[in-house]
Curated annotation (Swiss-Prot):
A GO term, aspect molecular function: proton-transporting ATPase activity, rotational mechanism
Recorded superkingdom: Eukaryota
Transmembrane regions: none
Protein name in UniProt: V-type proton ATPase subunit F
Natural source organism: Saccharomyces cerevisiae (strain ATCC 204508 / S288c)
GO biological process: endosomal lumen acidification; Golgi lumen acidification; proton transmembrane transport; vacuolar acidification
Role: Subunit of the V1 complex of vacuolar(H+)-ATPase (V-ATPase), a multisubunit enzyme composed of a peripheral complex (V1) that hydrolyzes ATP and a membrane integral complex (V0) that translocates protons. V-ATPase is responsible for acidifying and maintaining the pH of intracellular compartments.
Gene from which the chain derives: VMA7
Localization per record: Vacuole membrane
Keywords: Hydrogen ion transport, Ion transport, Membrane, Transport, Vacuole
Any one of the GO CC terms: vacuolar proton-transporting V-type ATPase complex
InterPro entries in the cross-refs: ATPase_V1-cplx_f_g_su, ATPase_V1-cplx_fsu_euk, ATPase_V1_fsu_sf
Other facts: Present with 4050 molecules/cell in log phase SD medium.
Membrane topology: Peripheral membrane protein
Length: 118
């Protein structure tokens, strides 16, 4: 199952997405013409759109190995992010230009702390 998961997907603001695309993670699947990124626009993107893309990348696509999501965007769908327990894709919360990273909010670090009894 993991051998066909080769892509990194992104749910992020425009600057973060642009930087990652320039670094080479952009991919459009030939069969379906689906992108592996979603650009969040402050004040325009709805919580439902974020949830739909998160579900699409985590449940419907079988070629995604890692999902990068800006932490401030993950906060909009925190319950959904925290409830995701599958091994693939790995969910990594990343900072953005305007929103610094807060380890107290990171769902992966919360699980690690819980595992070690902290």
């Amino acid at each position: 199952m993991a051998e066909k998961r080769t892509l990194i997907a992104v749910i992020a603001d425009e600057d973060t997405t642009t930087g990652l695309l320039l670094a080479g993670i952009g991919q459009i699947t030939p069969e379906t013409q689906e992108k592996n990124f979603f650009v969040y626009q402050e004040g325009k993107t709805t919580k439902e759109e974020i949830t739909d893309k998160f579900n699409h990348f985590t449940e419907e696509r079988d070629d995604i190995a890692i999902l990068l999501i800006n932490q401030h965007i993950a906060e909009n769908i925190r319950a959904r992010v925290d409830s995701f327990t599958n091994a693939f894709p790995a969910i990594l919360e990343i900072p953005s230009k305007d929103h610094p990273y807060d380890p107290e909010k990171d769902s992966v670090l919360k699980r690690v702390r819980k595992l070690f009894g902290e």
